[in-house]
């Protein structure tokens, strides 16, 4: 572990406003990522003094992305209060939400804010089919109608919206319909994709599978094609690279882990403000987190395959890899190398 940079380099914050995890969430997502670091913590709701301390400790903070506890529909009023504190200090805010609660929730969330200071609201929309929504969200108390009601409010108020699907094998064909639907109906041109991963699901069995390497490469290619045609802004993790792609990435392969970046993930806890530069790693290895009072950030440089790259894949897929370790997959005549999910295609057409 290296101590490389001070907190004054941080410009972008992603914030969990407490540690309720699945316990009090409005949904019960079967692929919920709040299964690692959070399940060991005492359930806790953050307070405004912690927000003020974050602002004090991060003097060059420009953007605060609020995820809630662990969704903004759980602690909507506190997320609103926190956003106002960031806004008061000339920090732009963003929100991530399942869309739970529709109009009622989004109106409470942004009440009293200057909408021009809201960079976007991100909606987790994994499918357009209500039965699939209920399955993935683990509840029938949310529907596409609720999500659309919330999105329409933002669109009407000129608050930027991005759609963030998480794709598993279960819904791997839904991405085209998602893009087309929101593009045509609401003129939404911003989509950021996640690949469903298992790093924080390892100690509980879930009926989900990771998308196969060749299928994922097909999805990435199709998303790029659609994005270019419709002039979209996209982010999509690459995950599996062939040899030619790996050769191009060699110079940058350790950049994130070794040098960090300008982004920080924070959880508000009962006994402090916990930080990490790599949320994936932190879910499995809490030693790569630190308390904000330490005044220093921690990074790790890895040679070869970071543990998280393997553990983000399900056991079935790992068993299909070349040496059973999830590092290399032999597909037809080429090798596909499993790389960190932070290596993403970020394009705006």
Language model features with spans:
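Conserved SAM/AdoMet-binding glycine-rich loop
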Residues: 34-37, 48-130, 160
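Alpha-helix termination/capping residues and helix-transition junctions
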Residues: 7, 22, 26, 57-58, ...
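Short hydrophobic beta-strand elements that form part
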Residues: 15-19, 95-97, 123, 165
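Flexible mid-to-C-terminal extensions adjoining Fe-S/redox cofactors in radical SAM and related proteins
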Residues: 1-11, 35-39, 272-349
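Radical SAM enzyme [4Fe-4S]-AdoMet core and its adjacent flexible, acidic
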Residues: 41-45, 116, 126, 130-273, ...
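Structural register of leucine-rich repeats
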Residues: 11-13, 62, 119, 189
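Short cysteine clusters
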Residues: 25-32, 257, 261, 275-278, ...
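Canonical Radical SAM [4Fe-4S] cluster-binding loop centered on the CxxxCxxC motif
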Residues: 2-49
């Amino acid at each position: 572990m290296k101590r490389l940079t001070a907190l004054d380099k941080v410009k972008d914050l992603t914030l969990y406003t407490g540690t309720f995890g699945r316990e009090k969430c409005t949904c019960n997502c079967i692929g919920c990522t709040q299964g690692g670091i959070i399940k060991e913590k005492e359930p806790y709701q953050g307070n405004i003094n912690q927000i003020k301390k974050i602002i004090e400790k991060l003097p060059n903070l420009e953007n605060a992305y609020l995820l809630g506890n662990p969704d903004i529909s759980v602690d909507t009023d506190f997320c609103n209060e926190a956003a106002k504190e960031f806004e008061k200090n000339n920090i732009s805010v963003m929100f991530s939400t399942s869309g739970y609660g529709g109009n009622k929730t989004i109106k409470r969330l942004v009440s009293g804010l200057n909408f021009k200071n809201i960079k976007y609201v991100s909606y987790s929309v994994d499918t357009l089919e209500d039965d699939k929504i209920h399955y993935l969200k683990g509840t029938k108390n949310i529907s596409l109608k609720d999500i659309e009601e919330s999105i329409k409010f933002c669109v009407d108020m000129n608050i930027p919206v991005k759609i963030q699907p998480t794709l598993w094998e279960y819904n791997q064909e839904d991405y085209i319909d998602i893009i087309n639907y929101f593009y045509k109906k609401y003129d939404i041109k911003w989509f950021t994709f996640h690949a469903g991963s298992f790093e924080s699901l390892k100690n509980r069995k879930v009926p989900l599978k990771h998308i196969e390497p060749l299928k994922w490469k097909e999805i990435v290619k199709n998303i790029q094609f659609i994005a270019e045609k419709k002039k979209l802004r996209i982010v999509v993790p690459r995950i599996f690279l062939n040899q030619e792609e790996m050769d191009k990435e060699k110079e940058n392969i350790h950049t994130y882990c070794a040098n960090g970046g300008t982004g920080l993930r924070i959880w508000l806890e009962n006994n402090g403000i916990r930080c990490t530069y790599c949320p994936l790693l932190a879910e499995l290895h809490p030693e790569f987190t630190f308390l904000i009072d330490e005044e220093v950030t921690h990074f790790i440089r890895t040679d070869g395959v970071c543990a998280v790259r393997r553990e983000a894949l399900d056991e079935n897929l790992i068993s299909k890899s070349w040496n059973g370790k999830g590092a290399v997959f032999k597909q037809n005549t080429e090798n596909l190398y499993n790389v960190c999910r932070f290596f993403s295609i970020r394009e705006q057409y």
